[in-house]
């Protein structure tokens, strides 16, 4: 499953006519068959695990980030008749957002990259491989440590490691090859010691 397709309570309360999940579905369809972009982040996690989670934005890696951003801007604007803008975030990439009176809506982040790491192709979409996705989540978790989004990174790591336990021993080697700092390696060592377990079907009622 790629798109969680979830209605948020705020969308319900505001009687939102254009749901974020609808935009995400269209973006994923736009990505099909392209070789200049790779999906990562939460929607990539959703591609590999059975229990999806909602995310505000779609995260992309591209070898032609600026042109891709312009294409996506035009595509979304024409398809949904909405005001779409691109903002460059220095040293990080490009952000595509919807301009709205009630507050702008963050839709897509695109990071520029020279060459792609290992990928898988699912539903005709290039997606970061499970190992590379786990590694990216470790780096993200450490960089956002203590902030709310770090806990979504940790959740993503847990479900990915449960889905691909055989990759656990390969993560440290991959991190070393990327010359990450000691803080990231220490974070991974702490995560690797965790004994993640699958939840029983009815455990979500235990509160």
What are these regions (language model features)?
Residues 1-207:
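Compositionally biased terminal segments of proteins
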């Amino acid at each position: 499953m790629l798109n969680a397709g979830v209605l948020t309570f705020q969308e319900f309360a505001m009687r939102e006519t254009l749901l974020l999940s609808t935009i995400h579905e269209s973006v994923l369809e736009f990505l099909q068959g392209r070789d200049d972009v790779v999906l990562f982040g939460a929607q990539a996690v959703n591609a590999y695990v059975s229990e999806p989670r909602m995310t505000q934005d779609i995260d992309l890696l591209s070898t032609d980030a600026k042109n891709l951003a312009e294409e996506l801007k035009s595509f979304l604007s024409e398809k949904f008749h909405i005001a779409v803008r691109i903002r460059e975030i220095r040293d990080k990439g490009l952000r595509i957002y919807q301009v709205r009176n009630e507050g702008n809506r963050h839709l897509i982040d695109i990071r520029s990259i020279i060459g792609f790491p290992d990928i898988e192709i699912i539903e005709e979409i290039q997606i970061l491989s499970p190992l590379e996705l786990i590694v990216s989540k470790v780096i993200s978790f450490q960089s956002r440590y203590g902030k709310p989004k770090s806990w979504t990174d940790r959740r993503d790591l847990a479900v990915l490691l449960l889905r691909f336990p055989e990759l656990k021993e390969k993560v440290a080697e991959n991190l070393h090859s990327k010359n990450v700092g000691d803080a990231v390696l220490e974070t991974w060592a702490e995560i690797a010691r965790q004994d993640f377990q699958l939840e029983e079907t009815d455990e979500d009622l235990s509160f």
